Amino acid sequence: MADQKILDKISKLLALSESDNPNEAAIALERAQKLMKEHSVTMTDVSLSAISEHNESIPTILKDGRLYTLLGDIISRSFGVTFLVISKHNNSRTAISGVCFIGPNDRIETAGYVFTVIARQLAIAKKNFLASYRSKLLEEMIEYFTSIGYIRDPETFRKTCTSLPKLYKSFFYIKSSCESRLRQATKAYLRGWLSSVSQKIDDFVYEEQETLLIEQYIQATYPHLRELRQHSVRFNREQMSHYHKGIKDADDNVNLFRGVTGDMHRRELGFKS
């Protein structure tokens, strides 16, 4: 395929060929055809030059596969782009390293930026949730060990045991179960949070030609794509309560607004807390 600068120049000339000025239109079309012949460029090449890709690494907060696919779907729906998951193969293991947004040149960079912005907001929500849930779990464990007689003076114990790691020193055998509860609760909460954000999104109205171009770009650039399989998720009663808390927190604290810039239809999502 020809150099991107050549393709851009041809695209501009073809746009000028639709001018209301007959002479100007004829000259522009002649120049475009000359460049296309000179560089062996087809109309398909010119059309596909309007489609490109933008990669973003997956933050630690999104290492759970369900989270980055949820967020990727939110971005795709809002900006009218497609997202792919980037994987790296190391010996017999496959690691997910990033996401790739594919679509019109004037939207993919903004889509990647908003992906990062929402991920940062999610990280803040996770930090706040963990701080709250750790305190709740610590108190729950202290009350439990008090009820079975392992802690005789809970008030004094609370003054010295101010965190879960300190509790583990006294009752080391509960560490595994507590950390598992923390992980599962956090996953449920974050999925609920993203579910709420997803409901706030207005789907981008695709143009049929644009959709076809994106599909052609993917087929030409990534002919050996594989489908990413994910298992369905089931929450127990406690995890479901955390899921709903995530929904409520995002409902209360996240407001999305969208800006449109000129003819580029640049859609930006921002946060107001």
PLM region descriptions:
Residues M1-S57:
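Long alpha-helical, hydrophobic tracts
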Residues D3-Q4, D45-S273:
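Extended, helix-rich structural scaffolds rather than catalytic motifs
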